[in-house]
Amino acid sequence: MIPPTSAQVTAEQNVLQTFFSHLGNFSYDKAKDHVEKEKEGNKSAGASWSLMLAALAHLAAAQKAYHSMSFLGQKQGGQLFFSRKDSIRTNYTSLYNELKKVVTTGRNAVGGTAPHLEELLSHLSEQLCYFVQAHMEIADFYEKMYTLSSQKFINAEELVKILEAILKKYSSRFHHPTLSPLESGFQLEVDVLAHLLKAQFLIYEWKFLPALVNLHNAHTKLQTWGQIFEKQKETKKHLFGGQSQKVAQPPHLFLWLMKFKNLLLAKFSFYFHEALSRQTSEMKTLTAKTNPDYFGKISSFIRKYDAVNVSLIYDTRGSENFQGHGYHHPDSYREAPKGMDQYPAVVSLPNDRPIMHWPNVIMIMTDKSADLNTLEKVVHFYDDKVQSTYFLTRPEPNFTIVVIFESKKSERDSHFTSFLNELSQSLKGSRAFASLKPGSKV
């Protein structure tokens, strides 16, 4: 590309850089106002520049709608409203067509009054077309995630593959230095989402260290993202004069990613409670602050209803290289578990798993596998020989929660079934996907 050298191009470049800087800081309204003011004050501008300014104003509006996730619909007064007319796909398609016009106009303006400017705008618009296409695909991806919230089990590994394919497709497609704020923001968002989905899958696979690494990476990148909002100030003008400033409210997408990370952290802290409890007291304090605090909820339930034990059982039969709690060297070898050891209690409260009850627990899991595999039923079993009652449910494949009482309890007792249903639903992760929709009470 011929480097733009004229004073005019420099002036236009300044407008563009300020616009993309605002957009990179998620200041959509400032970005939109900036180009609209330029358009209003420069009505004699050439065709390409006028088209570009109009397209950029629409880009700012589209990005605001995208980050607000309003295209998923919004609950208002109990009713679900979908703004089909203003759907993100319609907005982006219209914007794509506008940018294509700038590309064509710029290429046809050979020998015009500002060839360097025409070439720059054509080049930027071409790359922005890829940016728009990438966001259309990511918006579709979020819609897919939201749709999956109604499923009993979500295969996060499949989602990671789809997301990585999108990232690979558009990698380095909008690399112009002027667009670097957009490229950085896109990369940050997709990286955070990929880390979280990988962590979700790795927790399900019961892989401690890789899950921890992905959660940590997501946390670090969300902190970087959050600092952008902390630096943004919104000025509010008061009715009777005067004004005040407050930190800008992050968009729904960022808040949702934070929520998703916190839910995964809570699940991680529960599934790997044994390994984490061996850490420093500071680590214990940090994991106790998770929301929900599964350890705290279960401990309260045990005290209130005098349960002997609540365990999370991991069926290791389909797992490769199961090695037990904590860190393990990648090349270390451990013989595969056999017999009852194929069903370890990866979490057991208030103390170690009650070994005398384990044959019964495994028998119930085997006999009632069809009910448990529905991932929604609570199974009840009373053994009069040992005067003990067992309640079991399965939040996701390979994991079963069992509550043991050394007394007779009715299967109609809603205290126990409600507790297990709530615990199971919370661990599934489908609630996190459902809360992608703005206004969701999930």
Swiss-Prot record:
Protein name as it appears in the record: KICSTOR subunit 2
BP GO annotations: cellular response to amino acid starvation; cellular response to glucose starvation; negative regulation of TORC1 signaling; protein localization to lysosome
InterPro entries referenced in this protein's UniProt entry, alphabetically: C12orf66-like_central_sf, KICS_2
Role summary: As part of the KICSTOR complex may function in the amino acid-sensing branch of the TORC1 signaling pathway.
Compartment(s): Lysosome membrane
Organism for this UniProt entry: Xenopus laevis (African clawed frog)
A single cellular component GO annotation: lysosomal membrane
Subunit structure of this chain's protein: May be part of the KICSTOR complex.
Main location: membrane
Entry-linked Pfam families: C12orf66_like
Keyword tags: Lysosome, Membrane
Gene3D superfamilies in the cross-refs: 1.10.3450.30
